Amino acid sequence: MNNYVKLLNNLEELGLLNIKASIDKYIDLINSGNKSIVDALYELSNLEINAKSDRAMQACVKVANFPFLKEVTDFDFDFQPAINKQQILDLMTLRFIENKENILFVGSSGVGKTHLATSIGIECAKHRYSTYFISFQDLISQLKKALSENRLDIRLRHFCKYKILIIDEIGYLPIDIDAANLFFQLISKRYEKHCTIITTNTNFSKWSNFDLVL
């Protein structure tokens, strides 16, 4: 077995499959004098670094529990002219994360709230910010179950660990006193620490009704 074959075997053993796939091209470039050894090694190492980054990004997107993978480029702003496109594009820069700002999408069903919230969430996940998507009903169901099992603090800490938490469809179904209490416990724990993105069909002026049940 010659050293070339041993090299290929070593690369596979180390899991450096991107380098293995490109090694012949770079050997030819070096032999022809079109690439220095240092440049070749640098570019080959970048192939692995980029692949590792892509895998990490895909893992972040996968665990985020998105209902679908739609990005802002898939959104039809012409269909919803009332939506400020520039404002959405500004949110896609993710400046709101460093400022620990929250995002609230308000509107009736079918206007694209979930699509836009998901698009922002995907961008966050791609930049390897811990992100999680959950419907309000599922969130409250989990918190109520945890409360009944005397482990509410553990579950609240679970949802507080995410840098970006997306809570979808608040107000889609009636909210009882227990649900309101649990929701505001979570929000108060996340406030000014991490970012929360909320979609709701309830006008912001009516959110004071939540305070009444408390």
Question: What are the language-model segments listed below?
Answer:
Residues 8, 12, 16-68:
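Interdomain "pre-motor" coupling segment immediately N-terminal to P-loop NTPase/helicase cores
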Residues 70-92:
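N-terminal pre-Walker A segment at the start of P-loop NTPase domains
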Residues 75, 117, 135:
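Conserved hydrophobic/aromatic pocket- or pore-lining residues that grip, position, or stack substrates
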Residues 92-100:
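Phosphate-binding P-loop
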Residues 102-104, 164:
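Residue-level preference for the first positions of well-ordered beta-strands
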Residues 105-129:
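Walker A/P-loop
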